[in-house]
Amino acid sequence: MARYIGPKCKLSRREGTDLFLKSGVRSIESKCKIDQLPGQHGAGRKRVTEYGLQLREKQKVRRIYGVLEKKFRLYYKEADRRKGSTGVNLLQLLESRLDNVVYRMGFASTRAEARQLVSHKSIQVNGQSVNIPSYEVSAGDVISIREKSRNQSRIAAALELSAQAGNVGWVEVDSSKFEGVFKTVPDRSDLSADISENLIVELYSK
């Protein structure tokens, strides 16, 4: 399945929540009618079955992190293999993706933009160039912008937005050096309460 490149607002409306696919520190709710389904007249939401709820939650999380179905299923299998809560393990694996860490550090205004920076070899991990968006970052890894890429206007704009919004607690960033440290894998309490990972576990456990 190809990666979706259509209107980001449409995806957020379908899931009924802001998926943070667009740049900016403000929610898109003021621009996008989150409570209406896509379409000219925004059809009302029908009663959803248990399976439908599980499927929608999986699609929501998959779209937030920009992961295709095949890769998402592999993440679930790895999460299930590891000790602890499968749902929490899944979210931690997604949060440890290099493109997501670049986004969390404020070097990109969206995860899609972060994915481009990684793919275009603008990102280094511990001083070595890495161009794989799904690369799993470990606690203590130093993420930096390659020197030749530091003059990109989109990086400067992203850092400015990040300065307004603030960084998450599990990364430490020195914007003057264009680098940051992934201090630790976030706990479940650090992540969005708007995600019901247990619904995803129920879906894949069938």
Swiss-Prot record:
GO cellular component terms, semicolon-separated: small ribosomal subunit
Limits of the S4 RNA-binding domain: 96-156
Pfam family, one: S4
Keyword Repeat set for record: no
GO molecular function: rRNA binding; structural constituent of ribosome
Keywords, comma-separated and alphabetical: Ribonucleoprotein, Ribosomal protein, RNA-binding, rRNA-binding
GO biological process: ribosomal small subunit biogenesis; translation
The UniProt record lists the keyword Phosphoprotein: no
Oligomeric form and interacting partners: Part of the 30S ribosomal subunit. Contacts protein S5. The interaction surface between S4 and S5 is involved in control of translational fidelity.
Annotated family: Belongs to the universal ribosomal protein uS4 family.
NCBIfam families reported for this sequence: PRK05327.1, rpsD_bact
Function according to Swiss-Prot or TrEMBL: One of the primary rRNA binding proteins, it binds directly to 16S rRNA where it nucleates assembly of the body of the 30S subunit.
Official protein name in the record: Small ribosomal subunit protein uS4
Organismal lineage: Bacteria, Pseudomonadati, Pseudomonadota, Gammaproteobacteria, Thiotrichales
